[in-house]
Curated annotation (Swiss-Prot):
Keywords: Cell membrane, Membrane, Transmembrane, Transmembrane helix, Transport. One of its GO terms (biological process) is transmembrane transport. It is found in: Cell membrane. This is Putative transport protein YtvI. One of its GO terms (cellular component) is plasma membrane. The chain crosses the membrane at residues 6-26, 30-50, 65-85, 168-188, 225-245, 256-276, 283-303, 312-332, 334-354. It comes from Bacillus subtilis (strain 168).
Amino acid sequence: MNQSYITIFFRTLFVISMTAGSIAAAYYSFPLTYPFLIALILSSVIHPVVDYLDKVTGFPRTINVLGVLAFFLLAAFGVLTILVAEIVTGTAYLAKTLPPHISTFISYCEKLFTTHIQPLYNELTLLFQELETNQQASIVTHIQTLGDSAAKNAGLLLSHILEMIPRFFALLPNTAAVLIFSLLATFFMTKDWHKLKAMLVLILPDRVTANSKAISSELKKAMTGFIKAQAVLVFITMVIVFIGLSLLKVEHAATIAFLIGLVDLLPYLGAGSVFVPWILYLSITGQLPQAIGIGILYLVVLIQRQLTEPKILSKSIGIDPLATLIALFAGFKLFGFLGLIAGPAVLVIIQAFITTGALKEIWSYITVQQK
């Protein structure tokens, strides 16, 4: 066999093995390294600010890093305080307005029982009495089976809910530890950013350093674009919801629009977690015009999200809209709602490798081409 083909085969095998090994190592080490990955992301965000303060203030870098971290912590605490205040205000509003609605709902259930369920029960009882003995026994057996199954499922659901309570409290110390380690790692990474960068330049080959720098720049640009795109999408959702609720004369339209915009960011929940129960409640309590109005508003939010998300994402991260749409669909089919984030992220990484010429470098290595 030709020597070059053997070399190509083994180099291809080496590249595939290294790629698979890197993915496996990243996957299995993630539970141990994710606080430091968070720190790396935070450090990459704040170090330009620290560099600017180094030039302007002339203070030691340690003081500038502490100042920037303190500012970000205070900003996060401020946002959290505002959210808690909004939740408290909303809870007080619900405590004032819910009792009459609950009373209306109970009255509706009583009316439904007396006008529909009880007559239906009487009719079914008459039909049951007209059946033969073996048919009655069969129906009773099926009802008992359904009852046992429902009781079993209800017990399992209750046990899962009760198990989640100690798990939640057990997560609090771990969350606090992760937060502390992430902040400490962010401080040290940012303080020694240039030293660590120089150390990596000395350790890694020039070609790897150049490609890594280019890929990092592309990924940073894409990440910034992704955050901007999400901010734009949330803002559009908030504006549409605010206008719709204002037209429907719903109280606290601004607060509700703000909360729906934030919930719309969550992959598993989305705006539907607010709209769907709201529409059901309005329908049950007989407020059909309001329910139809909220339903139309929900459809408008859904349609605008589906139409604008691929276009805004593609424009922000510099990827073709069709490729973005394919990535969103493939990610959703493979990984569910989390795939809506994972799909574009993988596409961004592939795009970064193509743009920076890293794939070309790998291909040149495999095909034994000299540069």
